[in-house]
Amino acid sequence: MARALADLSVNLQVPRVVPSPDSDSDTDLEDPSPRRSAGGLHRSQVIHSGHFMVSSPHSDSLTRRRDQEGPVGLADFGPRSIDPTLTRLFECLSLAYSGKLVSPKWKNFKGLKLLCRDKIRLNNAIWRAWYIQYVQRRKSPVCGFVTPLQGSEADEHRKPEAVVLEGNYWKRRIEVVMREYHKWRIYYKKRLRKSSREGDFLAPKQVEGGWPPPERWCEQLFSSVVPVLLGGSEEEPGGRQLLDLDCFLSDISDTLFTMTQPSPSSLQLPSEDAYVGNADMIQPDLTPLQPSLDDFMEISDFFTNYRPPQTPTSSNFPEPPSFGPMADSLFSGGILGPEMPSPASASSSSGMTPLSGNTRLQARNSCSGPLDPSTFPSSEFLLPEDPKTKMPPAPVPTPLLPYPGPVKVHGLEPCTPSPFPTMAPPPALLSEEPLFSARFPFTTVPPAPGVSTLPAPTTFVPTPQPGPGPGPVPFPVDHLPHGYLEPVFGPHFTVPQGVQPRCKPCSPPPGGRKASPPTLTSATASPTATATARDNNPCLTQLLRAAKPEQVLEPSTVPSTLLRPPESPDAVPEIPRVRAFYPPIPAPTPPRPPPGPATLAPPRSLVVPKAERLSPPASSGSERRPSGDLNSIQPPGALSVHLSPPQTVLSRGRVDNNKMENRRITHISAEQKRRFNIKLGFDTLHGLVSTLSAQPSLKVSKATTLQKTAEYILMLQQERAAMQEEAQQLRDEIEELNAAINLCQQQLPATGVPITHQRFDQMRDMFDDYVRTRTLHNWKFWVFSILIRPLFESFNGMVSTASLHSLRQTSLAWLDQYCSLPALRPTVLNSLRQLSTSTSILTDPSLVPEQATRAVTEGPLGRPL
């Protein structure tokens, strides 16, 4: 049964139909005042309001309307007039309903805060609507009822299910929402009482002499909002008993919905509002639609997609156009940028130890030709040299960070420079700056006792060689402490080797600052790195050479190990390893000037995050043999750190690679699904075709299966055609039989069972005998027989006595056809004409009795004598 919804009008004071001592009292006799006794006779005779009556329907906390109507005069004691319509009810209430009503039984209107008298009026209105519809057979203007017995009304009897849209259009049933709302209200009431005991700002204000009793301030708090629930001091005694709290005070053991909802912001709860947490004084807002912090905590590729704003540098050198949009790398302006604070402040804020220049790192460029120092970043990525240390002269700083050219260790084939014009070398290096920015704080872990730090950087003999041909260059990342834990995200990348042309050695240009940028290299072993490790060289240089424009990114399965000298007995402390995401460099790459030595020496052990290594697969023999020109200088306490600049191009390359991988996986899955469907179809054919299912163990080829299936389908089509032809023949025979039956039925009389002529004559003889007998007693019956004979003959020919049902139907049809006045008038007129012509009733009426007796004894009845 659908639930009727009632909405009280704003003004319940309606004009009285007739002046009355109590205009709104339909069934109320609670006040035995003298002014009510006058209308007692009228009130006791008629039940005014309807079907449902109670003794005290007005025991509510609201003010009675009769107290607001003013004094009662003598004119108010007139007789009451009952309004049989629902007009007066509509003046008091506005009634709406949804669905269909079935019965007029009492309805509690659960979920609606209605006064008892309003519930009585609504139920009486529904009862009167039922009475109007089913008893008075009139259409009710209020609501309609259905009887769920048969037909389409059975579907209309179903309970309507409402849904509520929450959040991002999430549908839930209205019952669940109502239940949750009730629990929410009770939950906040309990929380309010708990907060009041603790004395927070949500509790009501204190009164003199301490806190008032809880029921008293709760009554003051909620009496204006829920007057029926708590009421006031003026509430009548029977008021609380009339309220049904079953729906409101429901079970609140499950507070899942209320506990998981995000709490409103502190800005929405001003401290001066003492009752802002009260559920009766606030309404649900749009807080569930606000973004939640949990939505951002499950983004695994947060750092890969992070692109900080580009930091302006002090370099005035132009960059190649191909590297213009890629200058906003992860560490741009943040690792060794000009805006960095002092080393002491940076190390204290970021937890890093700035590298001091105590040890030189000499590297050599393997490519020669027109070198363009301006294509490399300014000295913000380069550590300053120690003026106290004497190193071989190198003309230009080593540009390993932003646009690294191909670097080759002695004995290995070099890479080729890009044909960019040579420009002036960069100015002097900046002052000493910390290695990492405070944007990425790393913790400095002091070395444990008995644990030695990494050795000093290795000095490489410069042997620059020219070589044409651009290509993408991977960023080498080596030499991190052993045991850095790799996070699950961020795969290893392997760069395919490219064509390595022969290059002629060239001499480096004279003059220039001697500095080498730090290069972080991972500890994943490659053949060259393994050979270097055998020669006791802890600092490894990754091969940078020309390759294809696309870089194939392969997950590395080699575990990361620390490449340190075999004779080093000390272990490196196990520190969690952080993987850095470095993007690939698209072709072409700018040339590199010959590197110069730089000094990298921290005062204590430096915790460096584990960086991603892009290791090219070593396949040539020259790459497998160790580099013989690698000489190491390993002072204790020195850490060789090589920084390779991150570029955001890797994320784009990895996105493209992920798209290709996803496309490949999708293609493979689609192909597998297609083949599985084909196999499933052939298995189904084996089960359907009788010639194949008869021999399940016999392996049949797909061509044979298709041929047998085609033959089987042809046979089924022939059988179906034969069956359709047979069915058509049967339909034709059925039509012929129906036509014959209809022809026979048309020959039957329309009045029912035919009466034989013999039976008709027998009935006429019985009628004549009866007329003769009755005429001998009274001659007037003969006159009556003349009038009734045509009706008797029509009755004898039309009425059937096969069954009581047919007798009833034929008798009613005979009455309608022959006994109506239009049919009786000509029949009686003909009978009177016959009587006038056959007797002397018009000339000598005294002779009529004798003529009647002679007619029944001598001549045929009804015939003229």
UniProtKB/Swiss-Prot annotation:
<dbReference type="GO" id="GO:0005737">
    <property type="term" value="C:cytoplasm"/>
</dbReference>
<dbReference type="GO" id="GO:1901797">
    <property type="term" value="P:negative regulation of signal transduction by p53 class mediator"/>
</dbReference>
<dbReference type="GO" id="GO:0007584">
    <property type="term" value="P:response to nutrient"/>
</dbReference>
<dbReference type="GO" id="GO:0000981">
    <property type="term" value="F:DNA-binding transcription factor activity, RNA polymerase II-specific"/>
</dbReference>
<dbReference type="GO" id="GO:0045893">
    <property type="term" value="P:positive regulation of DNA-templated transcription"/>
</dbReference>
<comment type="subunit">
    <text>Binds DNA as a heterodimer with TCFL4/MLX.</text>
</comment>
<feature type="region of interest" description="Disordered">
    <location>
        <begin position="15"/>
        <end position="41"/>
    </location>
</feature>
<dbReference type="GO" id="GO:0008284">
    <property type="term" value="P:positive regulation of cell population proliferation"/>
</dbReference>
<dbReference type="GO" id="GO:0043565">
    <property type="term" value="F:sequence-specific DNA binding"/>
</dbReference>
<dbReference type="GO" id="GO:0042593">
    <property type="term" value="P:glucose homeostasis"/>
</dbReference>
<feature type="domain" description="bHLH">
    <location>
        <begin position="662"/>
        <end position="716"/>
    </location>
</feature>
<dbReference type="GO" id="GO:0045944">
    <property type="term" value="P:positive regulation of transcription by RNA polymerase II"/>
</dbReference>
<dbReference type="GO" id="GO:0005634">
    <property type="term" value="C:nucleus"/>
</dbReference>
<feature type="modified residue" description="Phosphoserine">
    <location>
        <position position="20"/>
    </location>
</feature>
<dbReference type="GO" id="GO:0008610">
    <property type="term" value="P:lipid biosynthetic process"/>
</dbReference>
<feature type="modified residue" description="Phosphoserine">
    <location>
        <position position="615"/>
    </location>
</feature>
<keyword id="KW-0539">Nucleus</keyword>
<dbReference type="GO" id="GO:0005654">
    <property type="term" value="C:nucleoplasm"/>
</dbReference>
<feature type="modified residue" description="Phosphoserine">
    <location>
        <position position="23"/>
    </location>
</feature>
<dbReference type="GO" id="GO:0003677">
    <property type="term" value="F:DNA binding"/>
</dbReference>
<dbReference type="GO" id="GO:0033552">
    <property type="term" value="P:response to vitamin B3"/>
</dbReference>
<dbReference type="InterPro" id="IPR036638">
    <property type="entry name" value="HLH_DNA-bd_sf"/>
</dbReference>
<feature type="compositionally biased region" description="Low complexity">
    <location>
        <begin position="515"/>
        <end position="533"/>
    </location>
</feature>
<dbReference type="GO" id="GO:0090324">
    <property type="term" value="P:negative regulation of oxidative phosphorylation"/>
</dbReference>
<dbReference type="GO" id="GO:0009749">
    <property type="term" value="P:response to glucose"/>
</dbReference>
<feature type="region of interest" description="Disordered">
    <location>
        <begin position="334"/>
        <end position="392"/>
    </location>
</feature>
<dbReference type="Pfam" id="PF00010">
    <property type="entry name" value="HLH"/>
</dbReference>
<dbReference type="GO" id="GO:0019901">
    <property type="term" value="F:protein kinase binding"/>
</dbReference>
<dbReference type="GO" id="GO:0000978">
    <property type="term" value="F:RNA polymerase II cis-regulatory region sequence-specific DNA binding"/>
</dbReference>
<dbReference type="GO" id="GO:0000785">
    <property type="term" value="C:chromatin"/>
</dbReference>
<dbReference type="GO" id="GO:0005829">
    <property type="term" value="C:cytosol"/>
</dbReference>
<dbReference type="GO" id="GO:0031667">
    <property type="term" value="P:response to nutrient levels"/>
</dbReference>
<dbReference type="GO" id="GO:0001227">
    <property type="term" value="F:DNA-binding transcription repressor activity, RNA polymerase II-specific"/>
</dbReference>
<dbReference type="GO" id="GO:0000122">
    <property type="term" value="P:negative regulation of transcription by RNA polymerase II"/>
</dbReference>
<dbReference type="GO" id="GO:0010255">
    <property type="term" value="P:glucose mediated signaling pathway"/>
</dbReference>
<dbReference type="GO" id="GO:0045723">
    <property type="term" value="P:positive regulation of fatty acid biosynthetic process"/>
</dbReference>
<dbReference type="GO" id="GO:0046982">
    <property type="term" value="F:protein heterodimerization activity"/>
</dbReference>
<dbReference type="GO" id="GO:0001228">
    <property type="term" value="F:DNA-binding transcription activator activity, RNA polymerase II-specific"/>
</dbReference>
<dbReference type="GO" id="GO:0061629">
    <property type="term" value="F:RNA polymerase II-specific DNA-binding transcription factor binding"/>
</dbReference>
<dbReference type="GO" id="GO:0003700">
    <property type="term" value="F:DNA-binding transcription factor activity"/>
</dbReference>
<feature type="region of interest" description="Disordered">
    <location>
        <begin position="500"/>
        <end position="653"/>
    </location>
</feature>
<keyword id="KW-0805">Transcription regulation</keyword>
